[in-house]
């Protein structure tokens, strides 16, 4: 324990001692070892972060959009220079394969920051003539101080997805990372400061989600909450935000997304997409296509093709370059996923491959769950209805297009969906009837910076990324101007 570094809070451009006197540990899920100890924020610390953010935001908003853009672009350059270093830290903290964190997590997060840095100068109002002597114009003004609450599966990417549009629009952000994977958010704060961000514009306060989340959502100064996490927690955050000061919210919540394989689909492509849609990042992706609908005529061949591909997955030490499937992010989460797998077995689903914990050699020390594929699934099974957030694919057979659309939509979730077919008319026809906010045709999973992402139904409120999100971090002020005489009726 003496070699374990203790991390403080990051407030006003520097590390500061938390006042709670409490700490918690970050655990490497590949072997169960403690990799860091973190101080936990108190309500007093949240107040300090808010005051700091208020001060920094005034300075930040007073800068020209071009000045803000240049600072954010510097942060992008630093992120890319330190890609490998940040990726190694992300792998230690999350258990995700380094082959993934080094090519996806930091890269795509930096892409989003670069995108919004470029848009900072594009925030503008409009001018509308009313008559010869009068017109009105609008201003898009920053909200002020906003808060981001991150999830544990994509720590630095989520921190960037939330902070990039907020900062580009002239706001300050207080960010609370997941207590399971808090380390790279602190590194991001350092990078923002190094790039020239005024002190207080990006503060990081880590600790227990229930306490800190409540303090942030109820704080009267904070104007918006952007939350990524589970549905039930999201409902509480939204209720708290509305019940305190009618805060604006963005909610990126859970999913149980359908992947529809059509009868004319290329079998190899369909199997490749299904495996990526379920086992990338060890299955810990909110948009995973965990309900795979397959025509009965293709079922046997499709299952065989999927199993062949799952056998090629390389499970191992996440720091090893050839590993493409690491442990789950925490041991408690591993137990939750294993309980779902047992539920699937008990409810009559057939295990085609996997079906338990990986215990061979060094894997026994980590939170490893074997990539698992269930067949003979029904819509009523828990593994089909509930978000597992792990490497568990459920294959369901269907007969008609009308049937599969109805069943795909028969869920309280609506985050993502996909269709695999060689008939482009069919692809659009099906997708247009699917109740989901992010859809893919003949591919899966890519979320470029330019594309708005978010869910229907209980999968979320609002969007992240894309041009539309920038507007969500501003408010519109309307100003009418009268150049002529003013006539009173009194």
UniProtKB/Swiss-Prot annotation:
GO molecular function: betaine-aldehyde dehydrogenase (NAD+) activity; metal ion binding
InterPro entries registered for this protein in UniProt: Ald_DH/histidinol_DH, Ald_DH_C, Ald_DH_CS_CYS, Ald_DH_CS_GLU, Ald_DH_N, Aldehyde_DH_dom, BADH
Cofactor remark from the record: Binds 2 potassium ions per subunit.
Cofactors required: K(+)
Family annotation (Gene3D superfamilies): Aldehyde Dehydrogenase, Chain A, domain 1, Aldehyde Dehydrogenase, Chain A, domain 2
EC number: 1.2.1.8
Residues that hold K(+) 1 according to the record: 26-27, 93
PANTHER family assigned to the protein according to its UniProt record, in alphabetical order: ALDEHYDE DEHYDROGENASE-RELATED
Described purpose of this protein according to its UniProt entry: Involved in the biosynthesis of the osmoprotectant glycine betaine. Catalyzes the irreversible oxidation of betaine aldehyde to the corresponding acid.
Family statement: Belongs to the aldehyde dehydrogenase family.
Name the UniProt record assigns to this protein: Betaine aldehyde dehydrogenase
């Amino acid at each position: 324990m003496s070699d374990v570094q203790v991390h403080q809070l990051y407030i006003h451009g520097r590390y500061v001692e938390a006042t709670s006197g409490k700490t918690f540990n970050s655990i490497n899920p590949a072997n169960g070892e403690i990799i860091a100890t973190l101080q936990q924020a108190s309500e007093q610390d949240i107040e300090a972060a808010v005051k700091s953010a208020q001060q920094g935001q005034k300075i930040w908003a007073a800068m020209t959009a071009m000045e803000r853009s240049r600072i954010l672009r510097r942060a992008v350059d630093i992120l890319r220079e330190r890609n490998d270093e940040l990726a190694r830290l992300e792998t230690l903290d999350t258990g995700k394969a380094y082959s993934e964190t080094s090519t996806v997590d930091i890269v795509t997060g930096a892409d989003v920051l670069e995108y919004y840095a470029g848009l900072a100068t594009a925030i503008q109002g409009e001018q509308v003539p009313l008559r010869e002597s009068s017109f009105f114009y609008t201003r898009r003004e920053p909200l002020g101080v906003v808060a981001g609450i991150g999830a544990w599966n994509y720590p630095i990417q989520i921190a960037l997805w939330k902070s990039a549009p907020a900062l580009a629009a002239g706001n300050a952000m207080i960010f609370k990372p997941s207590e399971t994977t808090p380390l790279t958010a602190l590194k991001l704060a350092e990078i923002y400061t190094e790039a020239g961000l005024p002190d207080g514009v990006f503060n990081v306060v880590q600790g227990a989600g229930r306490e800190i989340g409540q303090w942030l959502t109820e704080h009267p100064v904070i104007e918006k909450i952007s939350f990524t996490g589970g549905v039930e927690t999201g409902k509480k955050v939204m209720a708290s935000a509305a019940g305190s000061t009618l805060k604006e919210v963005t909610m990126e919540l859970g999913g149980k997304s359908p992947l529809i394989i059509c009868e004319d689909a290329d079998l190899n492509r369909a199997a490749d997409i299904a495996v990526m849609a379920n086992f990338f990042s060890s299955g810990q992706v909110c948009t995973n296509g965990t309900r795979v609908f397959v025509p009965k005529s293709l079922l046997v061949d499709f299952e065989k093709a999927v199993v062949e591909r799952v056998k090629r997955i390389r499970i191992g030490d996440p720091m090893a370059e050839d590993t493409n499937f690491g442990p789950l992010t925490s041991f408690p989460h591993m137990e939750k996923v294993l309980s779902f797998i047992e539920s699937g077995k008990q409810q009559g689903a057939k295990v085609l491959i996997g079906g338990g914990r990986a215990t061979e050699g060094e894997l026994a020390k980590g939170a490893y769950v074997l990539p698992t594929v269930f067949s003979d699934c029904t819509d009523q099974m828990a593994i089909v209805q509930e978000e597992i957030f792990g490497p568990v694919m459920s294959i369901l057979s269907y007969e008609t297009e009308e049937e599969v659309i109805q069943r795909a939509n028969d869920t309280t979730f609506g985050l993502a969906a996909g269709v695999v077919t060689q008939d482009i008319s069919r692809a659009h026809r099906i997708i247009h009837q699917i109740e989901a906010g992010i859809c893919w045709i003949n591919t899966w999973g890519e979320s470029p910076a330019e594309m708005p992402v978010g869910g229907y139904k209980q999968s979320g409120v609002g969007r992240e990324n894309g041009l539309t999100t920038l507007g969500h971090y501003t408010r519109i002020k309307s100003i009418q101007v009268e150049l002529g005489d003013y006539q009173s009726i009194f």
